[in-house]
């Protein structure tokens, strides 16, 4: 922003309150990339927890004799959660693998291990829920 009274240009950078005083958050800055990786990883963990909760609700529904229609809704939400989890794991895993290989940082390796476990869980849940839906519908 140009200030004619001061006769020089003032640069205003927008940053999160936790990032004040750290490196600038640009597209290619290491701090921005690190925050993106951690955001994707938190999203993977949240989707994994949501998928676990929906799966437990499905199991509870089997024991409590929920209506078939509500079980189909729960299964469809499990399939949707599984798809989102797999896509998020692939995105986060690619970034984590890149940073682990280029920077040789142990934290990225730990995040990558958790993401791979979540990816396998999501793929297994996706296959299981899809098979149950197909068998239950009879098509």
From Swiss-Prot:
State the compartments where it is located: Cell membrane
The organism's superkingdom is given as: Bacteria
What is one GO cellular-component annotation here?
plasma membrane
Segments traversing the membrane: 38-60, 72-94, 114-136
Q: Which UniProt keywords apply?
A: Cell membrane, Membrane, Transmembrane, Transmembrane helix
* Keyword Transmembrane attributed: yes
Please report the record's description of how this protein sits within the membrane.
Multi-pass membrane protein
Protein name (Swiss-Prot/TrEMBL): Uncharacterized protein TP_0787
């Amino acid at each position: 922003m140009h200030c004619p009274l001061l006769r020089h240009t003032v640069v205003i950078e927008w940053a999160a309150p936790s990032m004040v005083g750290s490196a600038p958050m640009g597209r290619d800055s290491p701090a921005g990339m690190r925050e993106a990786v951690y955001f994707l990883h938190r999203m993977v963990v949240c989707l994994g927890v949501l998928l676990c909760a929906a799966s437990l609700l499905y199991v509870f529904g089997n024991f409590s004799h929920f209506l078939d229609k509500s079980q189909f809704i729960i299964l469809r939400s499990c399939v949707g959660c599984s798809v989102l989890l797999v896509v998020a794991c692939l995105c986060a895993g690619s970034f984590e693998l890149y940073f682990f290989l280029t920077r040789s940082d142990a934290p990225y390796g730990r995040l990558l291990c958790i993401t791979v476990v979540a990816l396998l869980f999501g793929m297994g849940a996706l296959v299981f829920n899809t098979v149950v839906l197909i068998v239950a519908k009879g098509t």
